[in-house]
């Protein structure tokens, strides 16, 4: 960033900011859901049209909540949480959980899912 210490305040140029365009908008949830084969995963669509995907061994879970995830301390909607991914750990290594907002681009979530699936191996 171009900075002139002799002048009070902050000054820069558009070129110095290196403005970028970023992927925004929820996108198409099927970009994520299509990553899961019927042979290896169970798919459930509930009465709220939320989608739940789990691995046959039960160690992987993905939830898609287009209107936000239900639940919370007062059973209110957890507003803004649109995607939940969880992998159960083992006796020796803890698992992990991550969540993405309802406006997170599905393309970004799909990339995360693809990477997780690439790391799993049959026993």
Q: Residue ranges of each PLM-predicted region?
A:
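Cytoplasmic membrane-interface segments at the C-terminal ends of transmembrane helices
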Residues: 114-122
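Negatively charged, low-complexity tracts enriched in Asp/Glu with abundant Ser/Thr
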Residues: 2-59, 123
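Intrinsically disordered, low-complexity regulatory segments enriched in Ser/Thr/Pro
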Residues: 1-5, 60-110
